[in-house]
UniProtKB/Swiss-Prot annotation:
<dbReference type="GO" id="GO:0016747">
    <property type="term" value="F:acyltransferase activity, transferring groups other than amino-acyl groups"/>
</dbReference>
<dbReference type="GO" id="GO:0004144">
    <property type="term" value="F:diacylglycerol O-acyltransferase activity"/>
</dbReference>
<dbReference type="GO" id="GO:0071769">
    <property type="term" value="P:mycolate cell wall layer assembly"/>
</dbReference>
<comment type="function">
    <text>The antigen 85 proteins (FbpA, FbpB, FbpC) are responsible for the high affinity of mycobacteria to fibronectin, a large adhesive glycoprotein, which facilitates the attachment of M.tuberculosis to murine alveolar macrophages (AMs). They also help to maintain the integrity of the cell wall by catalyzing the transfer of mycolic acids to cell wall arabinogalactan and through the synthesis of alpha,alpha-trehalose dimycolate (TDM, cord factor).</text>
</comment>
<feature type="binding site">
    <location>
        <begin position="276"/>
        <end position="279"/>
    </location>
    <ligand>
        <name>substrate</name>
    </ligand>
</feature>
<dbReference type="InterPro" id="IPR050583">
    <property type="entry name" value="Mycobacterial_A85_antigen"/>
</dbReference>
<comment type="subunit">
    <text>Homodimer.</text>
</comment>
<feature type="binding site">
    <location>
        <position position="170"/>
    </location>
    <ligand>
        <name>substrate</name>
    </ligand>
</feature>
<keyword id="KW-0732">Signal</keyword>
<dbReference type="InterPro" id="IPR000801">
    <property type="entry name" value="Esterase-like"/>
</dbReference>
<dbReference type="Pfam" id="PF00756">
    <property type="entry name" value="Esterase"/>
</dbReference>
<feature type="binding site">
    <location>
        <position position="198"/>
    </location>
    <ligand>
        <name>substrate</name>
    </ligand>
</feature>
<dbReference type="GO" id="GO:0046677">
    <property type="term" value="P:response to antibiotic"/>
</dbReference>
<feature type="binding site">
    <location>
        <begin position="86"/>
        <end position="87"/>
    </location>
    <ligand>
        <name>substrate</name>
    </ligand>
</feature>
<dbReference type="GO" id="GO:0009274">
    <property type="term" value="C:peptidoglycan-based cell wall"/>
</dbReference>
<dbReference type="GO" id="GO:0005576">
    <property type="term" value="C:extracellular region"/>
</dbReference>
<feature type="binding site">
    <location>
        <begin position="306"/>
        <end position="308"/>
    </location>
    <ligand>
        <name>substrate</name>
    </ligand>
</feature>
């Protein structure tokens, strides 16, 4: 029996179990997947080739009481914010560790911004420091990304606080859409790659909490409170689709189906996580269209696992679209309409 057949059988069996046992069973599988996919050792060096004009900035954050490291490549007044995954490190952003993103966007007319850190943060403003791992300050990533960093970059690097793109993967896929939903002038463009797009639904709060606890011992209740707290829906892209439609935000949503291609990612955790995530992405697409959304690209190919080569492929694919939206460049040849 294949791993996916075992998972399907487990999910079917879980429907007959008491809720607590069912959550524990599925949670164990999800945490296994997250550990396998994101649990690698710290990387000593980043991918950027020598010669690129990449700067390592220290941007003050009054809300978090510390300076935040930001990797920055200047390229124009409008920027692409590249947000990291669940196991974000404190040395380099995962986009730089795992992809040639700086090189791919060099001389594109766009600046590239990679905030560093934020493990298990969901790039949101938390209620309090994590109560399970001794964190001595409160994550305030939304405040940093929408107020503190834009003001500093405008004053010091000439980057506009408006007209930018937010691109996130996995943990931060939904974060990118939420930033655009609430800050439409700053982010007229948002992309989610293999994101968790309905975090307030069903088992997702519990599963997310288990994953966060595994990734650094973080407590989801310290982030958004119990699952009944309004913060879960406030930060749920599915719930906030009407905002994205009303804003006419340009969105790019990608998710594979768990089948590897020649790009790699042929391992059980990466395949399982992508298959688990696909359903909410498809539901997001359908709900967006039903709510009148007509400014989205939805890519659900017959392959793709929860791994960096697929996300980088999408980052390259969306470059012309981002340039068109942010800089008014020639639009890509293929029309971008909600997929059927």
């Amino acid at each position: 029996m294949t791993f996916f057949e075992q998972v399907r059988r487990l999910r079917s069996a879980a429907t007959t179990l008491p809720r607590r046992l069912a959550i524990a069973a599925m949670g164990a599988v999800l945490v296994y997947g997250l550990v396998g996919t994101f649990g690698g050792p710290a990387t000593a060096g980043a991918f950027s080739r020598p010669g690129l004009p990449v700067e390592y900035l220290q941007v003050p954050s009054a809300s978090m009481g510390r300076d935040i490291k930001v990797q920055f490549q200047g390229g124009g007044p409008h920027a692409v914010y590249l947000l990291d995954g669940l196991r974000a490190q404190d040395d380099y952003n995962g986009w730089d560790i795992n992809t040639p993103a700086f090189e791919e966007y060099y001389q594109s007319g766009l600046s590239v911004i990679m905030p560093v850190g934020g493990q298990s943060s969901f790039y949101t403003d938390w209620y309090q420091p994590s109560q399970s791992n001794g964190q001595n300050y409160t994550y305030k990533w939304e405040t940093f990304l929408t107020r503190e960093m834009p003001a500093w970059l405008q004053a010091n690097k000439g980057v506009s606080p408006t007209g930018n793109a937010a691109v996130g993967l996995s943990m931060s896929g939904g974060s990118a859409l939420i930033l655009a939903a609430y800050y439409p002038q700053q982010f007229p463009y948002a992309a989610s790659l293999s994101g968790f797009l309905n975090p307030s639904e069903g088992w997702w709060p519990t599963l997310i909490g288990l994953a966060m606890n595994d990734s650094g011992g973080y407590n989801a209740n310290s982030m958004w409170g119990p699952s009944s707290d309004p913060a879960w829906k406030r930060n749920d892209p599915m719930v906030q689709i009407p905002r994205l439609v009303a804003n006419n935000t340009r969105i790019w949503v990608y998710c594979g189906n768990g089948t590897p291609s020649d790009l790699g990612g042929d391992n059980i955790p990466a395949k399982f996580l992508e298959g688990l995530t696909l359903r909410t992405n498809q539901t997001f697409r359908d709900t967006y269209a039903a709510d009148g959304g007509r400014n989205g690209v939805f890519n659900f190919p017959p392959n793709g696992t929860h791994s960096w080569p697929y996300w980088n492929e999408q980052l390259v694919a969306m470059k012309a679209d981002i340039q068109h939206v942010l800089n008014g460049a020639t639009p890509p040849a293929a029309p971008a309409a909600p997929a059927a």
